[in-house]
Amino acid sequence: MIDSIHVSQAGVEGPSPWWLKGGAIFIGVLGLLSLLNAVSLALGGIAMDAMMGEMDPEEICAEDEDTEECEDFIESIAQFSSMPLWDIGAAFSALLFLLSIPTTILLWNAEDRDMALKFAWGWVFVHAFSQFYITHEFLEWYGTFFDSIPIEDFQWLTQFTSFLSYGGVLMCELTLAAGLVLISYKTRPPTKLEAPSAFHVNNE
């Protein structure tokens, strides 16, 4: 018969700090990739503007059999070069890089778990929002681009591309969120009350 449950007087061992440190390494790497993405988007936007500035739709399409469709095609490319996607995407990537710095430091130090996780969740939220925004803006142009191509039955392709693009972003962000949930669970504060076991049961 169980008469009592033994409660250990010794301090309970805390969770491993390497869960938070692992999150710090992962977000740190993604932060560096965000910096590279910010630079590439900024330079890409400048290059596209320069390229389209040298293109004259009327001159390019002068000898085309269907001048109107040719000019519509060139115009759709011009719209792509002038999209806010380049500037806003670069700004989002730069923000993710800057936000990753304090997030990585807090996670690596593993001293203030709650604050570190708040920064980490904030980083994941900004990352998710930016990815869905960039994907949405690109697919909006993508649909217009295929409308300018004089080939029928392309509607299925744009729908299929949208499904894959949004689905891919959703899976990526859910994976990040799941990883952060796991880190939150593994680093939760321990309790001093130990579960009863055969070693902690006193029988009289």
Residue ranges and their predicted role:
Residues 2-204:
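Topology signature of small-to-medium multi-pass alpha-helical membrane proteins
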